[in-house]
Each structure stands twice: as structure tokens, then as C-alpha cells.
Amino acid sequence: MSNENRTCSFCGKSKSHVKHLIEGENAFICDECVSNCIEILHEDGNDGTPSESAGGEPEESGKLPTPAEIVANLNDHVIGQEQAKKALAVSVYNHYKRLRHPKAGANVELSKSNILLIGPTGSGKTLLAQSLARKLDVPFVMADATTLTEAGYVGEDVEQIITKLLGKCDFDVEKAQRGIVYIDEIDKISRKGDNPSITRDVSGEGVQQALLKLIEGTVASVPPQGGRKHPNQEFINVDTTNILFICGGAFAGLEKVIRQRTEKGGIGFGASVHSKDENADITKLFGIVEPEDLIKFGLIPELIGRLPVIATLEELDEDALINILTEPKNALVKQYQALFGMENVELEFEEGALRSIARQAMERKTGARGLRSIVERCLLDTMYRLPDLKGLKKVVVGKAVIEEGREPELVFEP
């Protein structure tokens, strides 16, 4: 194309009608269109020049929620666990504050506040991590430590966690490098004894060592679009230095390790007296856990050193489980009431029924996680027949429905 026939690919003006015509690959743009683009960016509050953040990355837009705001949001989704919420909120706030103001700590190296959550099954560890990520609007991924193996063994190696994180943000590396990773069942990869085994520990200490590199900060090489690694292929490099890692586990048996440390032992007047409430005992002991207890349990010292914030969650009692059933925004009772409401039917749970549901969950040792299966079981037949029950106005779930397996009371229009 001759110089005279060249036109702006956006407005169509020829070179003779504008001051400058900038040439790109198979396209042209004039100086007037460039000016218009700059004005649009200014109107949107973005001049096109990203501010510097940690690692030379653009700083996130939007206000960083304060610890109090984070806790208030967590209260909408998670019942109780006030100390754990505070510990999480402060750690997460400090972590992202550090990323947004890298120059403020130029003379002091600010360490990352990775978190270890210790609490029984169904106490809210996973839900806390999920709710945090949702509030902060950052990529979030969960991994099960029991499925991880050392690189070179059959199974999921630790770098696949980063592959999943990239997938959550459409392989946007900058977003992934500021995400949150929650690793569940971290207690299940503890080494089985104080002395390292002479045999290969595929899913124990070896995995802890591999996770250590990821948590303390390394450049992970991830195959494009999450494919398998092959020789001579290009990889996506992801720096894990600013990824926040939250590890969680039930740590069954840790209370015995703590008790051994805190008690002198003995008989007669020197013997220790335990509470009749075993759950209260365990909660109290978890509250005084020390790094040395976790090392004796089977976590390697280096990994514990990279998880400086330890938050313990309490065993949920009957009242807490009832509150979980009814109070949060996504409470189970509200969910089922919404489902019945779509059929123009009111659903009511009597107080006795709620207590029975909570009691059964406690007996099963499943915590909040077991509530849904109990409610689902008692409503299954009713939900099966619901669309065909003409004139039905109300379903009442009483204590006998939960404890004796009776049918809920059905109230029809007169």
C-alpha cells in the first residue's frame, strides 16, 4: 500500500488529514485516535501506567479491607471461632498491605504471614479460607495434602497446585502470584517417627520438603494451559514468593503430645485431673500448642518455620451447630427453605428438630460437615414427592422426624 492510500484503521482518516499515522502489523492508528484512547483511560481512573508493587507488578486497585471488616465478613459465613478469625484477618491484612506498599519496608525485610489452622473436622477451616479469598477477590485454590507426592512419583506433585491456581485466573500470572492456596489435611503427611526412614517416604516428609520450597518462595515452572510436562516445551514461570499459603488439619493425637509437655505426670496428689468434657480438654490444649509439639507430631521444623501464624479452632458444641444451621447467609435451613419456596411451600424446623440434628452431628464427630447429610436424609422422601403434592402449603419438621425417622407433617390448603 502506498503512503498516500494509508488510512487509520480506527477512524478511517488518510495520512494527509492527520499529523501522524503510526504503523503496526497490518494496521495503522492516527494521533487523534491515540489522544481519544488516553482520554478514555483517564476517565476510567487509569492513565495506562501501572503503579509499581512488589516484584515490579501492577498494584491492585480498590481499598484493602481492614481486619475488622474482614472479620465482619467472615461472621456472615462462619459461626464462632472468634480468635481464629482475628488471627486470619490480621495476617491476611498484613500480607496484602506488604504487597501494596513494598517501598515502606525498604529498610526492613517483611516476611510472609503464612497460616496454619488447627482444628477438628467440620470446625470451619476450609470455609474460613474460602470466605477470605472471596472477600479479597483474589484467586483461590484448594489442595489435599494426602494426594500429593514427591516429583517423579505417580500422583500429583506439588507444582500442580500452582497449575490449578493459574487455571482459576485464566492463566494470568500476575493474578496467580497474589492468590491464596489452602492445603488441607497437612497433618496427614507427618513423618511417622522421629528418625527419618531409610526407605523412600513418597507422601510424608518428602512432600513436606517439596511444599517447603513452594511456601517459602520459588519459581515454579508450569506447563502451558495445565498440560503435562514434556521435554523441550516452554513453561510458564510463576513466582510463589507472594502467594499466601494457608495449611489446615485436624491433628488427631496432637493433644497427647501437648499434654506430655505440659504435665509432670505422677500419682496421688501429683496426678493431673482432666475435665469430664474431652472436647473442652482438647480445645484448651490446642490453644497452647507450641512449634515443638508440631515437630514431635511429625512436621519438619523448616515447614513450621514457614507457617508463623498458628490459629486454633474450637470443637463446635450443640448451640454452635444450631446457629450454623440457621444464622449464616448460606445456612442450611435457609437453603432448603428457598428450595421449598420455589414450589410455593413453606418449610419449618421446630427447635427440637434442630437440636436433634446438632446432637447427631456431634455423635458422628463430623461437626458442621455432617449437618447436610442429616437434613437431606430426613427431607429426601418429601422433596421427591413435593412437585406432585397439589395444594401443599407447609412442611413441618419435628423432633420425631430426626430421631425416629417419621415423615414430616404436611399442611394442605383447606
Curated annotation (Swiss-Prot):
Keywords of this entry: ATP-binding, Chaperone, Metal-binding, Nucleotide-binding, Zinc
InterPro entries membership: AAA+_ATPase, ATP-dep_Clp_protease_ClpX, ATPase_AAA_core, Clp_ATPase_C, Clp_protease_ATP-bd_su_ClpX, ClpX_bact, P-loop_NTPase, Znf_CppX_C4
Highest taxon in the source lineage: Bacteria
Keyword presence, Lipoprotein: no
One GO cellular component term noted in the UniProt record for this chain: HslUV protease complex
Region span, Disordered: 44-65
PANTHER family registered for this protein in UniProt: ATP-DEPENDENT CLP PROTEASE ATP-BINDING SUBUNIT CLPX-LIKE, MITOCHONDRIAL, ATP-DEPENDENT CLP PROTEASE ATP-BINDING SUBUNIT CLPX-LIKE, MITOCHONDRIAL-RELATED
Purpose of the protein: ATP-dependent specificity component of the Clp protease. It directs the protease to specific substrates. Can perform chaperone functions in the absence of ClpP.
Protein name, as recorded: ATP-dependent Clp protease ATP-binding subunit ClpX
Origin species: Neisseria meningitidis serogroup C / serotype 2a (strain ATCC 700532 / DSM 15464 / FAM18)
Gene this chain is encoded by: clpX
